[in-house]
Amino acid sequence: MAREFKRSDRVAQELQKEVAVILQREVKDPRIGMVTVSDVEVSRDLAYAKIFVTFLFDNDPEAIKQGMKGLEKAAPYIRSLLGKAMRLRIVPELRFVYDQSLVEGMRMSNLVSNVIKNDEAKHVAEDSE
């Protein structure tokens, strides 16, 4: 019988929870600020983890750049805390990636809203003629 989830998926879910807690409670770097862990991808051999993050200040590219530098600097410390919190033989090497999917989703939503608004205005103008 096949398992419902692969082990790497289960480890990724647990990593997401633990990293979110560590970033919220343990990491004190002011460059990081309010960060959200949106997703985690773990390699099949569990040696590498790609952690997708978003920031509260998504509209400021310089703040995002500084936040990512802060996360890269804190990665070894976060990894050591993960080693204490999780029972893994090998704690994955962490790589932080800025997740633009939320920003792109908002942009697409705004584009659709604008098209609908323009279409409704066009129909109202045609009906009044």
Swiss-Prot record:
Subcellular location: Cytoplasm
GO molecular function: ribosomal small subunit binding
Pfam families per the UniProt record, alphabetical: RBFA
GO cellular component terms attached to this protein's record: cytosol
Top-level taxon of the source organism: Bacteria
Record keywords: Cytoplasm, Ribosome biogenesis
Record flagged with keyword Cytoplasm: yes
Signal peptide boundaries: none
GO biological process: maturation of SSU-rRNA
Keyword Cytoplasm: yes
InterPro entries: KH_dom-like_a/b, RbfA, RbfA_dom_sf, Ribosome-bd_factorA_CS
NCBIfam families the record matches: rbfA
Subunit and interaction comment: Monomer. Binds 30S ribosomal subunits, but not 50S ribosomal subunits or 70S ribosomes.
Job description of the protein: One of several proteins that assist in the late maturation steps of the functional core of the 30S ribosomal subunit. Associates with free 30S ribosomal subunits (but not with 30S subunits that are part of 70S ribosomes or polysomes). Required for efficient processing of 16S rRNA. May interact with the 5'-terminal helix region of 16S rRNA.
Protein family: Belongs to the RbfA family.
Official protein name in the record: Ribosome-binding factor A
UniProt source species: Actinobacillus succinogenes (strain ATCC 55618 / DSM 22257 / CCUG 43843 / 130Z)
Lineage, top ranks: Bacteria, Pseudomonadati, Pseudomonadota, Gammaproteobacteria, Pasteurellales
